[in-house]
Amino acid sequence: MPDDSTAPKRILSGAQPTGQLHLGNYLGAVRNWVSEQRQYDSYFCVVDLHALTVPQEAAELRAATRRTAALYLACGIDPERSTVFVQSHVSAHTELTWLFNCLTPINWLERMIQFKEKAIKLGEEVGIGLFDYPVLQAADILLYEPHLVPVGEDQRQHLELTRDIARRFNDRYGESLRVPEMLIRKEGARVMSLQDGTSKMSKSDPSDLSRLNLLDAPEKLRDKIKRAKSDAVMGLKFDPARPECTNLLTIYQLLSGESPEAVEARFADAGFGRFKPILADLVIEYLRPIRERYDAIAGESGYLEGILREGALRASKVAGLTLERIRDRMGLLPPF
């Protein structure tokens, strides 16, 4: 491993270009990426290869990849400070996945809960790529030797596998790979569905009413909040027995910056008929700058392509050095 004791710690994260990025993605992840750019050497990837583990329409995948990258920038990721790139633009990801496949026991992958859950939904359509998804994820991470990987609770098991693969490689071939630490945040990490306060807001939820997409028009945001599941109890408070109420208050608290206590005091005597329009106004104004920046980025010919081209070059340089070291340790003859 290179000696980087004086360099800023490196952090890596990314999102699949499936569906649209929503408020839960922003509050749980992207907002933290933006605020931490000055602190870390940051790499942010659009993981399009992971999207292929389930059937995709080619034209929509290309459009969604561009949209996701543009949203990274619109949300405040600064390409002068951070490396923004598309996973498939760096070929080292797939090569290292194969090398790690030759190192990873099958029973490690058979324990992955997410594969079991998705395999049930897909039935006979499930492919090897979905089974191997965690190994590709390990390659994504270890190529850039990050010190920290922001991860939600639903990805904790996959990162543990990444750490196991790194340790196994180091045990077999000598200390070569940094074993990354998890960065798990509690606040804002679980914004819930607007239709079910016990389920996480998700891009894959079949109901578009369940989420507030970052690019939703103002009138659509207002309608979704108006139709969000709630209860008839007067007085709003954070209460596990009232998950939908808690979720809507959480969104308000995270966007307003007020403390939970202040939010409860403000709406102690309110019902949802009063609260929902206030929340809608807050969400609309909060997301307005993101939508405006997105429109500007999408309308500037060649800008996004240039950012992704430069990002791929920077990412390839770092990933190539790691891959070269791994190939050497594993005994592969270098190309002439």
Curated annotation (Swiss-Prot):
GO terms for cellular component: cytoplasm. CDD domains: TrpRS_core. SUPFAM superfamilies: Nucleotidylyl transferase (SSF52374). ATP binds at Q16, P17, T18, G24, N25, G152, E153, D154, V191, K200, M201, S202, K203, S204. Its EC number is 6.1.1.2. It is found in: Cytoplasm. Transmembrane segments: none annotated. The keyword Aminoacyl-tRNA synthetase applies. It comes from the Bacteria. GO terms for biological process: tryptophanyl-tRNA aminoacylation. The keyword Magnesium does not apply. Belongs to the class-I aminoacyl-tRNA synthetase family. Homodimer. This is Tryptophan--tRNA ligase. The gene is trpS.
